[in-house]
Amino acid sequence: AIEEAYQAGQRIFAESRPQELAAKVKTLEARRVELGNPAYMADIEWHFIGHLQTNKLKMVLPYVSLIQSVDSVRLLEAIDNWGRANNKVLNVLLECFISSDETKQGFSEEEVQDIVSGEKKYANIHISGVMGMATYTDDETVVRSDFRKLKQISDMLQDWIGEGGNIDTDCREISMGMSGDYPIAIEEGSTMVRVGSMIFGAR
């Protein structure tokens, strides 16, 4: 399925489970060896979009260009430490809590402010923007309101650019919208949607 999507022009793929990400990367590496073609699908960009435990970093960080789901200071610090040890700067999105579903993960707006203010520096992390998941409901008014909260946090981040904190002018990504609600997300300012179920089917 990934090869079909690639042939259709898709280059950015995302995975929510560390083991499956590592397995897919290794499968593609084996395919290149089998074909004798190191360039085969070598321009794929992998994003990680699931809950990431600190003990699974080595299964994810070597392979991804963006971690969309950084939802705690502990994880942020662990990624920064891994980057320092491996001489690599990691691109991340700060996952924000925007829904009325208390089981969802993420930072509050105040916590995001603390991170970007620069009181603690993250030298091996590049904050590329924010990510959020709306309330799982058929009520479009609620979903739209959730997405607007994330857009407001993104707008707040723009005010910090140039203030010497942990962000720069590239901090503009807003990852919101999934297979069931992406049209609303796009209307509310999303720059990145997560629509794997719509393309590849449910797991």
Protein language model regions, located:
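Divalent-metal-activated hydrolytic enzyme cores
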Residues: 191-192
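Conserved alpha/beta-domain cores
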Residues: 1-180, 188, 200-202
